[in-house]
Amino acid sequence: MIRDILSRHPDREFRRRKVQKTVTAGPIVQWVGGKRQLMDRYMEIFPKEINNYFEPFMGGASVFFELQSRGVIKGKSYLSDLNTELIVTSNLIKSGRFAEVARLINEINEKHSKELFYEIRNVDRVRTGNKKYKKTAELFDILDPVEVAARFIYLNKTCFNALFRVNGDGLFNVPIGRSEKKDFSDYGQLKSAASVLSKAEIKHASYENVLELASPGDFVYFDPPYEPVESGSEKSVGGVLINGNNFTSYTVDGFTSEDQVRLRDCCDTLNDKGVSFALSNSNAPLIQELYKSYNVKTLEVNRTLNSKGDKRKNAAKEVLVTNF
């Protein structure tokens, strides 16, 4: 289906960037609230040697990539998330089919435009009037895995600030970002990521799955959707201040304050089992209260995502909770 869409759009000329001969392995997608800015601080705090590693809110898995690059993980790695497209894409890259994905992304890239973005975004829906859309089919019923992965990466690279958001019908509804031509079909980057991802088990699962697998000597890192910093219109997602509650919906069900309490209970169980964990979240009063019996470090980070331009460069405070 994706190639049928491409056949209706003209090629557009653009200047390609030079291909790097050496590519450092890193996340295949950009993720809101990514931890690159805090990584050095995290590495100072995290265990220097880990048996098995768990990252239940996988996202871009930047912490996993960093720990692997430092040789800290001695055993197995388990990455999981409830975002089905993310898991399908990651497993496809891991399986060695990165060349097929890169090739299709390149074909999309050759024709990138605002019109193409929305046509690819809307393959699983139809317009019903008043600019509203209705879901017509499950994405995996109409696209093969390579198309799913290429679409996911393309939308991530071209949508508004790499935000992943779905509406109540489970439809990805983030608008296009800056629509000028880009070259993001990086075969080398996908290949290097595949090499590192091959060291992990990647599955679609709830964070509670770690309770069955983690043992003393293992390390669990939680990076859940963040608790809102304040009530009202301003929300915090992944440490990012957002105006408008609809920006918090990574899944149809969202992640509520009640979910934050259940996550704390999960951390309590891990602690009772002697499993080391760390958790990132906002500096919200609820988070401070839930984790007051643990080590809570407040960190300042510059975040750029906001729906109003005059607040784009505000510094935000978030916390890192540890039981060690």
Describe the residue ranges of each PLM region.
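Conserved S-adenosyl-L-methionine
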Residues: K48-S113
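Short, polar loop motifs at secondary-structure junctions
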Residues: G59, Q189, N281-P285
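SAM-dependent nucleic-acid methyltransferase catalytic core
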Residues: I2-R41, I93-Y221, P225-T248, R262-D265, ...
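Conserved acidic-Pro-Pro-aromatic motif
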Residues: G217-K311, A315-K317
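Short His-Asn-centered micro-motif
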Residues: P56-F57, S80, K203-A205, F222, ...
